[in-house]
């Protein structure tokens, strides 16, 4: 029998029954956007994408740690609080070259994920660095899309991973540090992949191998928030997709000084991001204080110690694309909202990346295509 559409409902049907039939046919699908709130980027990217679905067809749910709920601004969908490890814990472990999650944490995440699935009953899950979804979404048989960066793709044709900024590598000559890191990298990638692999085995799932890149990109579909021209790949599977830079603005008003900035001197935009070493910001501002420039800086929510130089204007958050548009030079930590979003490149600004972001090569890979101008 041919199914009825809402326009073909029998005219003689009871009005209440007719309304009920229409509503059942118009039920919306539920999309759950799941952010791991360890850095601003992992919350901002799904927040930017959540505006895309047609709300007449899809019910939108956003899940993240409550500490980041304010970033939702005037989001009209449903919010579900789900805990994440502290950002400081995440960054400290990265800075020491340690796996950011242990097995117990990922197991707890899986239980939290499944509880949320039971409550929300999503038809689709879109996650950003919520590694436990590799297990929980499969257990619940829910299609899972993961937002990632192409430099974490196993198919990225990287000639050699740059040396990360770690305590040991900072003490060694760059040549020696490079040689040692190239020898140790496979072991480091295996070490970071092990906790998720252990959780997968507990639930009877196959190993992803000894490569953290597969742990970071295990999903039914992978969405790379990058441009393929910057990150060439080899034999990219059909379920891996380049979706381009994800542009996001924090839900805050611009500071009072924003519209009063003079255009007589070059503007330098400084942001060390939420995953950089914010304690370095005063030193960067001081280094720029004697130049004939106007400095605008974002602290990404952290407090700023010391006096602000006379040529500097500081706010917790700034609209990155607009700041890049106004700036002649962008000084950043190589974070994914600064470089991988290509905001400065879009507006033809020069970029200087302060090597401050911890990790096992993330910021270095992300900004390897950026020319660092002499200034």
Regions found by a protein language model. Give the residues of each.
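Short beta->alpha connector loops
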Residues: 66, 129-131, 228-229, 275-278, ...
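Donor-nucleotide binding loops and adjacent catalytic segments primarily
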Residues: 50-51, 70, 226-329
């Amino acid at each position: 029998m041919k199914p009825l559409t809402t326009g073909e409902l029998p005219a003689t049907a009871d009005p209440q029954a007719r309304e009920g039939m229409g509503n059942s046919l118009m039920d919306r699908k539920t999309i759950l956007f799941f952010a791991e709130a360890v850095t601003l980027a992992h919350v901002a990217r799904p927040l930017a994408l959540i505006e895309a679905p047609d709300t007449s067809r899809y019910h939108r749910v956003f899940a993240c740690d409550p500490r980041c709920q304010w970033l939702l601004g005037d989001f009209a969908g449903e919010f579900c609080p789900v805990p994440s490890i502290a950002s400081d814990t995440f960054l400290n472990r990265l800075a020491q070259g340690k796996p950011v999650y242990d097995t117990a944490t990922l197991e707890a995440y899986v239980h939290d994920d499944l509880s949320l699935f039971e409550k929300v009953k999503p038809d689709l899950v879109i996650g950003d660095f919520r590694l436990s979804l590799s297990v929980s979404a499969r257990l619940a048989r829910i299609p899972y899309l993961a937002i990632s960066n192409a430099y974490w793709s196993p198919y990225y044709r990287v000639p050699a991973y740059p040396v990360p900024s770690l305590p040991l590598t900072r003490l060694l000559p760059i040549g020696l540090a490079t040689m040692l890191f190239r020898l140790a990298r496979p072991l480091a990638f295996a070490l970071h992949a092990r906790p998720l692999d252990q959780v997968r085995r507990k639930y009877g799932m196959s190993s992803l191998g000894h490569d953290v890149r597969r742990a970071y990109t295990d999903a039914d579909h992978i969405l790379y928030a990058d441009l393929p021209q910057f990150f060439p790949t080899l034999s990219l599977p059909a379920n891996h997709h380049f979706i381009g830079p994800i542009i996001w603005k924090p839900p805050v008003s611009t500071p009072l000084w924003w519209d009063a900035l003079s255009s007589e001197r070059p503007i330098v935009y400084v942001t060390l991001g939420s995953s950089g070493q914010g304690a370095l910001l005063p030193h960067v501002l001081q280094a720029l204080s004697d130049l004939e420039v106007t400095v605008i800086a974002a602290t990404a929510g952290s407090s700023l110690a010391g006096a602000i130089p006379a040529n500097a204007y500081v706010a917790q958050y700034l609209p990155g694309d607009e700041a890049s548009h106004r700036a002649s030079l962008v000084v950043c930590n190589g974070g994914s909202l600064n470089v991988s979003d290509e905001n400065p490149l879009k507006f033809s600004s020069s970029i200087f990346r302060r090597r401050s972001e911890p990790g096992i090569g993330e910021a270095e890979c992300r900004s390897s295509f950026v020319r660092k101008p002499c200034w």
